[in-house]
Amino acid sequence: MLSKMFDTHERAINVRVAGLNHFIWVTDVFVHARDVTEEAFRRICDGEAREIALSDAAGDTDPFLNTWGLRTELCGLYGYLPAAGDRHVCEFLPGYLRDEKERERLDLRVTSVDLRRERLAANTERPRRMIRGEEPIPTERSREEISEIIAAMWTGEDSVNIVNLPNAGQVRDLPLGAVVETYGVLNAIGAHASSSESSRSR
């Protein structure tokens, strides 16, 4: 979304993040190494990201779509941007899920257990079709970072990823030793905090 807002490639966007397990927040935004945090958060709070998401969705009823309703709201309330999509963030804030009017206002899409079972069956069958040669194996790079992590731990070359580690100063407002989710360095000796990535409340 940030790359669309700033009309640039995803690789030109860098962020700092901080939070607790799976509930992390973008604290700083950079485009081509220029700090655009204030502008980015202002534009998000003004609804730009939500408008883009709704336009992209264009009537799509897929319950797995994120339309930026909750993220926009929370950015306005707290001054930071939730890093995960609405569907994941709302799991930490059940009040939004319980209230049907709030779900509708923010376009929070919930999924039934039956739909999850259907998706699981489809997602299990697809690799089987690939193994049987009935469907080509995708060759484009996945957005998942596990291959980079495995390669770093095998080769010893550093890979910087978002990880859960004991706080060693990455989040200055939280107690040392508390498990926090921030950028960390992974290599042959494991995962450790990145001393260059620290965040605190503004």
Where do the protein language model's features map onto the residues?
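Long, compositionally biased stretches enriched for glycine and/or charged residues
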Residues: S3-R202
